[in-house]
Amino acid sequence: MECDLMETDILESLEDLGYKGPLLDDGALLQAVSAGAASPEFTKLCAWLVSELRVLCKLEENVQATNSPSEAEEFQLEVSGLLGEMNCPYPSLTSGDVTKRLLVEKNCLLLLTYLISELEAARMLCVNAPPKKAQEGGGSEVFQELKGICIALGMSKPPANITMFQFFSGIEKKLKETLAKVPPNHVGKPLLKKPMGPAHWEKIEAINQAIANEYEVRRKLLIKRLDVTVQSFGWSDRAKSQTDKLAKVYQPKRSLLSPKGKVSVAHLLAARQDLSKILRTSSGSIREKTACAINKVLMGRVPDRGGRPNEIEPPPPEMPPWQKRQDGPQQQAGGRGGGRGGYEHSSYGGRGGHEQGGRGGRGSYDHGGRGGGRGNKHQGGWTDGGSGSGGGYQDGAYRDSGFQPGGYHGGHSGGYQAGGYGGFQTSSYTGSGYQGGGYQQDNRYQDGGHHGERGSGRGGRGGRGGRGGRGSQGGGWGGRGSQTYHQGGQFEQHFQHGGYQYSHSGFGQGRHYTS
């Protein structure tokens, strides 16, 4: 049923296309397609459709009709190449075994349908295409140029049997006769004197094409500017009523402006040496002769708008001017932190070490004074006797008490608690502690020590905010001051509220080594 419908459509289309072959008879088409490529009548119909297509389309492949079934394989190869060039969309005609594609009746009908549709489309495009402009006077472009030369030189029409050599010899002779009648420098010497070969002419043509493309862009830009400028004049209410008059005047002149130039290699051959003279159009002497009154009428005098670099004021600074940094109010060393601070080096067992930190009630901690018999400092005050929380004398030794928040702490939270010390049990004191990130150390002799000694050496270094310096490694032994060697004693180390606290217990008969 499907094949019958396809046959009917094919027969109607063949009649419309002007086919006059034998396959228009009843049953002839079905008999031909049933044999496929082995039928000479089928191959002749395909060859006729392809020949009509080649007239309208640029096809390289061609199909020849067969005279016998033995040529069917060659015919199918030709059809395969043609369909590949035409980008046939039917897979059954472009895939599979080439020698067996057109042996199927349905594929043969599909091939005829495809070729007929392509031919119909090509003819419709040809009819709807705009007709080519006929050249004035007839003939090719070269003929028109030669005809113009003959007319300009006043030559008669050459005979029909003249050769090209004779024709150009006649033109050369006529040119010499014409040049003899004018002054010697009337035409001038040519600008291009060197002979050129085919390779040179190709390069010259390429250069000319590149320059032509560049100037075409410039011409389009200028024409677009002109269109926009003229269009802007029509924006006013007064000009809107004159739109038709403006278009009637502007459009004829606008149509004469072509974006493509007409300069060719022929203009290079016709160029004379007078074109190589370079004239300065901006010099005063030239402008005196070339200036016209229209320039002043159009422009007139305009006010000076400035803009000269030497007259422009410098821009304001992007950043505000820097001011000298002002020092803050002087305060006592202490509080929290305080860096390294300073340290006093004393040569006696009185004050020594750092004055840094904060006392319980003051902003600084004066860790000094003489020991012996007066107890210790506790939260900024003196108390009689010693205690575990506040420190104090223990068997005659001075123990450290510290600040309540952030300094020496005798058993309360914050900073190194109770510092660390290692000194004479009964005659010297070495305290180490943290005060808000700074390290404090006080080394001194107590009463009962050797005062003839050198103070207690150096006080510990002011530490950086996490280390106790050399004087106290993490709250350990105190500084480089006087060290005490004990025999028969032991340390008890324990933590209280996040800090270190060292207490000496069980020191028996400590012996002091001094210089």
From Swiss-Prot:
Residues 302-311, 444-456 have a biased composition (Basic and acidic residues). One of its GO terms (biological process) is positive regulation of gene expression. Residues 382-394, 457-481 have a biased composition (Gly residues). GO terms for molecular function: protein methyltransferase activity. It comes from the Eukaryota. Residues 297-410, 432-515 are annotated as: Disordered. Residues 485-501 have a biased composition (Low complexity). Transmembrane segments: none annotated. Residues 502-515 have a biased composition (Polar residues). Pfam families: DUF2465. Interacts (via N- and C-terminus) with DDX1. Interacts (via N- and C-terminus) with C14orf166. Interacts with FAM98B. Interacts with PLEKHM1 (via N- and C-terminus). Positively stimulates PRMT1-induced protein arginine methylation. Involved in skeletal homeostasis. Positively regulates lysosome peripheral distribution and ruffled border formation in osteoclasts. Belongs to the FAM98 family. This is Protein FAM98A. It comes from Mus musculus.
